[in-house]
Structure formats: C-alpha cells, structure tokens
C-alpha cells in the first residue's frame, strides 16, 4: 500500500488560510453597519383628559330650559 505524500500540504494550507482571511476582511470592510440612532427631541403632547371641564351640550342639564 503506497504511503500518502504530505510534504506539499503546508504549502497548500498556508495560502488557503491567507486567502480565507483576506476574503473575510474584504467582506467585513464592505459591510454597511447601521449608525446608532440619534436622540429624538420629545415634544410634550396635550392629551385630552376627561377630567378637564369643557362646556358642551353634553354637560348641559336636561332639567333646565334651553337658553338662546
């Protein structure tokens, strides 16, 4: 049974690893990463609160005669 010749293996593995490293580096360099979000200025919104009294027909008493 013939012996497996392994003398050329290091000369094949070293360039292969170098090539894989370079390809990986090029892919990482060309990747567009998202920028961190900028802080957003928060504006205070006026929400309608049910406890704020607003005079509408809903609040008028039914027992009183209509006023014009």
UniProtKB/Swiss-Prot annotation:
Q: Where N6-acetyllysine occurs, residue numbers?
A: 54, 57
Topology of this chain in the membrane: Single-pass membrane protein
UniProt family annotation: Belongs to the ATPase protein 8 family.
Q: Which PANTHER family match?
A: ATP SYNTHASE PROTEIN 8
What Pfam families is this protein classified in? ATP-synt_8 (PF00895)
Question: InterPro entries in the record, alphabetically?
Answer: ATP8_mammal (IPR039017), ATP8_metazoa (IPR001421)
Q: What does this protein do?
A: Subunit 8, of the mitochondrial membrane ATP synthase complex (F(1)F(0) ATP synthase or Complex V) that produces ATP from ADP in the presence of a proton gradient across the membrane which is generated by electron transport complexes of the respiratory chain. ATP synthase complex consist of a soluble F(1) head domain - the catalytic core - and a membrane F(1) domain - the membrane proton channel. These two domains are linked by a central stalk rotating inside the F(1) region and a stationary peripheral stalk.
Keywords attached to this entry: Acetylation, ATP synthesis, CF(0), Hydrogen ion transport, Ion transport, Membrane, Mitochondrion, Transmembrane, Transmembrane helix, Transport
The answer to whether UniProt assigns keyword rRNA processing to this entry is no
Provide the assembly information: Component of the ATP synthase complex composed at least of ATP5F1A/subunit alpha, ATP5F1B/subunit beta, ATP5MC1/subunit c (homooctomer), MT-ATP6/subunit a, MT-ATP8/subunit 8, ATP5ME/subunit e, ATP5MF/subunit f, ATP5MG/subunit g, ATP5MK/subunit k, ATP5MJ/subunit j, ATP5F1C/subunit gamma, ATP5F1D/subunit delta, ATP5F1E/subunit epsilon, ATP5PF/subunit F6, ATP5PB/subunit b, ATP5PD/subunit d, ATP5PO/subunit OSCP.
| Protein name per Swiss-Prot or TrEMBL | ATP synthase F(0) complex subunit 8
The gene from which this protein is expressed is: MT-ATP8
GO BP annotations of the record are:
proton motive force-driven ATP synthesis
Any single GO molecular-function term of the entry would be: proton transmembrane transporter activity
Species of the source: Gorilla gorilla gorilla
Report the GO terms under cellular component: mitochondrial membrane; proton-transporting ATP synthase complex
Parts of the chain that traverse the membrane: 8-24
Where is the PTM N6-succinyllysine found along the chain?
54
Q: Where in the cell is it found?
A: Mitochondrion membrane
